[in-house]
From Swiss-Prot:
Family: Belongs to the PdxS/SNZ family.
Organism of derivation: Mycobacterium leprae (strain TN)
Key words of the record: Lyase, Pyridoxal phosphate, Schiff base
Taxonomic lineage of the native organism: Bacteria, Bacillati, Actinomycetota, Actinomycetes, Mycobacteriales
Entry protein name: Pyridoxal 5'-phosphate synthase subunit PdxS
Entry GO MF terms: pyridoxal 5'-phosphate synthase (glutamine hydrolysing) activity
EC number: 4.3.3.6
Enzyme superclass (EC): lyase
Function of the molecule: Catalyzes the formation of pyridoxal 5'-phosphate from ribose 5-phosphate (RBP), glyceraldehyde 3-phosphate (G3P) and ammonia. The ammonia is provided by the PdxT subunit. Can also use ribulose 5-phosphate and dihydroxyacetone phosphate as substrates, resulting from enzyme-catalyzed isomerization of RBP and G3P, respectively.
Length: 307
């Protein structure tokens, strides 16, 4: 579904643009899909042709951001608009944590979603963006349930469990998805009095804690990101509870991006069918080189950004 049709469907179903229901509904429409990082229009067209449900427009994929260092900021508006013009699927773009003016610019450009991203250099170490002030839906990362609920309380319409972006090492994504799922399971077993205590421990609003305990899930869509480089990685994260996949460097840093992109899309759809997974894992060529997360010093880990 292209971005215009998606927006029209959200309005027809929910009746009003910019409300929490509409923004969460737009995120729901991406469930079960793969969102791919792209840096040029040709990559965006490859992603769309491979079955991606959306693309993330940025000037450097996370592995290049990590390798080149320096301050990483919002992408150039001309580059973002060239991606928007190249595809019919939704386009996301990243703003720095806390940089509400970058978010204002991205909304003005007409992106379909904004990712307040730890991959970029944070602009504010005490405040995230007040996402309620925007009509465009926001995506935010989280390493645990408390972090996820704080972002939702700020207006996030989608949460992605944080892996370590730009590494090709899925271990952090696994750790944080298990942490979120484990925290949710724990809440479902608590009494009302214990949930008050849990809300304080999580530094999260009691109302959201109650909702999670009652429904056994987050109140918004939960994707995963960071380190996913193979079809098997994508399928594992779906089996662990992700409702969709972000893939950054793993596709366009591989030897055959189009084939790997299509394989990861298929693995995300048929994540519980080992026969399909074996088939799509064949003949993909070399995956991205990758970095062992354990070799990265804690202060240099992107997933630790945010609070």
């Amino acid at each position: 579904m292209d971005s215009a049709a998606q927006s029209n469907q959200a309005q027809s179903v929910f009746g009003q643009t910019g409300t929490a229901r509409v923004k969460r509904g737009m995120a729901e429409m991406l469930k079960g899909g793969v969102i791919m990082d792209v840096v040029i229009p040709e990559q965006a067209r490859i992603a769309e042709g491979s079955g991606a449900v959306a693309v993330m427009a940025l000037e450097r994929v996370p592995s290049d951001i990590r390798a080149q260092g320096g301050v990483s900021r919002m992408s150039d508006p001309d580059m973002i608009e060239s991606i928007i013009a190249a595809v019919t699927i939704p386009v996301m773009a990243k703003a720095r944590i806390g940089h509400f003016v970058e978010a204002q610019i991205l909304q003005s450009l007409g992106v379909d979603y904004i990712d307040e991203s730890e991959v970029l250099t944070p602009a504010d170490y005490t405040h995230h963006i007040d996402k309620w002030k925007f009509t465009v839906p926001f995506v935010c990362g989280a390493t645990n349930l408390g972090e996820a609920l704080r972002r939702i309380n700020e207006g996030a319409a989608m949460i992605r469990s944080k892996g370590e972006a730009g590494t090709g090492d899925v271990s952090n994504a696994t750790t944080h998805m298990r942490a979120i799922a484990g925290d949710i399971r724990r809440l479902t077993s608590l009494s009302e009095d214990e949930l008050y205590v849990a809300a304080k421990e999580l530094h999260a609003p009691y109302e959201l804690v109650i909702e999670v305990a009652r429904t056994n899930k987050l109140p918004v869509t939960l994707f995963t990101a960071g380190g996913i480089a193979t079809p098997a990685d994508a399928a594992m994260m779906m089996q662990l509870g992700a409702e969709g996949i972000f893939v950054g460097s793993g596709i366009f840093k591989s030897s055959d991006p189009a084939q790997r992109a299509a394989a990861i899309v298929k693995a995300t759809t048929f994540y519980d069918d080992p026969d399909v997974l074996a088939k799509v894992s064949r003949g993909l060529g070399e995956a991205m080189a990758g970095i062992d997360v354990e070799q990265i010093a804690q202060p240099d880990r992107l997933a630790q950004r945010g609070w």
